Each structure stands twice: as structure tokens, then as C-alpha cells.
């Protein structure tokens, strides 16, 4: 018995095409009718009249036949259009029983393991509520649920659920970013879930939340000091893969909040320090037999220092910039000739705050924050065959710019500028994997971060050191060692 597959949408489009063809033919017949049905005789003789009458008769017969075909065409289009509705109604009627049957069969299959182990045999894990972990996937087949993003009541993101035998791990939830002006720290991201133990990718780690900016200072006796910016939340690690699969990427660290500004114009109070950037997290390990390691997460950018307040007396000192977050370590590779994950880049240091202006003495600018250290590249494992390449080390973060000194109106000069921050050091590259064939290449070292410049009068920051390249793996021949990272530029 042959089977017929019908897609109502395609059938409806075909009916519209057939209707447009009929309309075009009717228009052509109508345009030709006046000139073909009333052919004039070429002369006054009987032969010419007979020929004209013969052709005119043919035209009238054609028009009559065309009218019959037009009626048939209209009936065909109506039948085709009606069949679209019939098929659509049949699909709608059959869909609900089939879905119900599917749910009943799955419920019967999952009932024993759900009762004994609290986990289904087949099916995806549920996504977590805010700040809660995602559910585990089915023991045999199913992806882990994603962790819920953090909120005010549960600032840290939930972890992603683990998969069973086959399936991908759930992604970790992002950390909560509190409201500006509170100076609260950002929530940490959740860890990625593990991939299926036989086959499946690890879930990505959740990103850290952004730290809130600090509150500005206020007047009074004594004046209310400005509050520092909140630190960015740390990212969490990516999930490990199973036997086959790629490790999850590590979460990115959250940015630090800006420091609050000092009070103006009463006290000329100092600005507050910017928050530190959150650390990036490690990438997940690649599959134990074959799979790439996940990349490490980047460190968060630090917050800028608050500006110093202005006053009739001495202006306030600008706040120091925060330190950039460190990059995460790259995930290790599997033994089947895969690549290890690259280390995450260090976060940039925050800029120093501007010194407060004054009619007498300008305030000093804040010191720029130091850049974060790059993450180490992932290592490769011993392989059968050619060795695998290691991950590159992460670059160090750039140092923050030193704050500008405050302006002295009456003495026509400026306050001392802040020093630039130092660049972060680049990380070492991972070691290449050995093998029975050629050894894998070592990972390149990360470049050092550039030192922060000053804004006139202050000392510039020093560039960070480049990371050391990883050694090549042992093999026939041995792998090539990775190149060392470049020294960062001085500010």
C-alpha cells in the first residue's frame, strides 16, 4: 500500500497558484474574443464572406469550450481549497491523541527510575527557577536543565543540570546584577552541568553579575563618605564532557562597579575606590576519549574610581580604580588528539577618579587599577597517534589610566595626577600532548597587558610580563614549544 504525505500549507499555496493560472487564461480569452469572433470579410465576394464566417465560427466554438473549462477550473480550485481545510482539521484532531499517547508511554517508561532514583529514564531536565539548579537529564537520554539566573533574593546563579548517558549538560545561570548606587557585589554565576557520561558536551559556566556603583558622598558634619563600587561576581566553571564531547566554556567574570563621587561643594570629600572585576572561570575538560577542552572565561573589567569632590578649601582625592579580574584556565583535552581550551584574558584595571577642583588646592587624581592576570592555557593528554595541541595562555589585562589632578583656579595650576595602573601578566601556554606519533605543539604564552598612562604629572604604569610558551609534547618527532608572550607596553 502506498503512503501519501500532505502538508496543508503547501496544498493551500498550490490552490492559490492554480487559481491565478485560471484568472490569467480568462483574461487572455476575453482580450482575444472581439477580434477573433467577428472576423471581417476580405472582399465583397461570397468566398471571402464564407472564409470570414468559418474563422468566426471557430472562434465562437473556442470561446464556448473555454467557458466550460473555466467552470471546471473553478470547481477544481474549490475542491482543492476545501481539501486543505479537511486535512488541517484531521491533523488537529489527531495531534492531541498522539501527544497524549506519547506522554503516557514516557510516563510508563520513566515511572520505575523516577520512583526509585527520583530521575526519569528519558527526558530533559527542567530549567531552574531564579538562583536554583537545573534538573538532571534522563538516565539514558536527555539534556540537563539550565540553571536559573540570580535575582535579589538568590543572587548567585544556579548550576546547570547533569546529563545522563547521552545528552548535553545544562548551562549555569548568570549572577545577579544589583541596582546602581548600592555598592553591592554582583552574584556569582552557576557551574555548567556535566555532559552525558558516554557522549555529550559540558554546559557553559554562568557569567558573574556586574557590581553596583557606589553611592555618592553627602554633606553634613561630618560629611557622609562616598561608598566604593561593588566587586563583580566570579564566573563559574564549564561542565566536563563525557567520553566524547567538548567541555563547556568557563563563565566570564562580572565587571566591577564605579566608586561613588565625593561630596561637593561643601567638604571636598574623597572619591571612593572602584570595585574589582570578577575572576573568569575554568573551561570544562574535553571528553575523556575524544573532545576539545572548553575555553577559560575572561576576567571582568574593574570599576572606575569616584571623582573627588570640589570645595572652597582643598579638593578631594579621586578614588583608585579597581583591579581587573583574572582569566580562567582553559580546559584539558581528551586523549584522542583533541585541542585544549585557551586561557581567558585578564580584565582591564579601572581608571582612577579625577581629583576635585578647588579655589585653593586641587585634589590628587586616583591611581589606575592593575590589570588582571591571564588564564593558563589548557593542557593536552597523551594520545594514540599524533599528540594534541595545548591551549594558548590568556593575555593580561591593561592597567587603568591614572586620574587627572584637580584644577586650582586662583593659583592657575593643577593638583597632582594619579599614577597609571600596571598591566597584568600574560599566562603560560599549556603543555602539548605526547603521542605514539608526532608530539603536540605547546600553547603560546599570553601577552602582557599594557601599563596605564597618567594624565600629566603622575607616573605611568608598567607593562605586564608575557607568559611563557608551553613545552611541546613528546613524540616522533617531538612537538614544537609555544612562543612566549610579548611584554606589555609601559604607559
UniProtKB/Swiss-Prot annotation:
UniProt subcellular location: Cell surface
InterPro entries named among the record's database cross-references: PE-PGRS_N (IPR000084), PGRS_rpt (IPR048996)
Annotated Pfam families: PE (PF00934), PGRS (PF21526)
Gly residues composition bias: residue spans: 207-221, 229-238, 444-485
GO cellular component term, pick one: cell surface
Gene inactivation effect: Deletion mutant is partially attenuated during murine tuberculosis, but not during the chronic steps of infection. On day 28 post infection, shows a slight reduction of the bacterial burden, but on day 70, bacterial counts of the mutant are similar to the wild-type strain.
Induction: Expression is down-regulated in macrophages and infected mice.
Location of the region described as Disordered in the Swiss-Prot/TrEMBL record: 207-238, 255-275, 444-491
PE domain boundaries: 1-93
Subcellular location, principal: other
Family: Belongs to the mycobacterial PE family. PGRS subfamily.
Additional notes on this entry: Expression of this gene in M.smegmatis leads to low levels of NO and IL-12, increased level of IL-10 and better survival of recombinant strains in macrophages.
Protein name, as recorded: PE-PGRS family protein PE_PGRS26
Upper lineage: Bacteria, Bacillati, Actinomycetota, Actinomycetes, Mycobacteriales
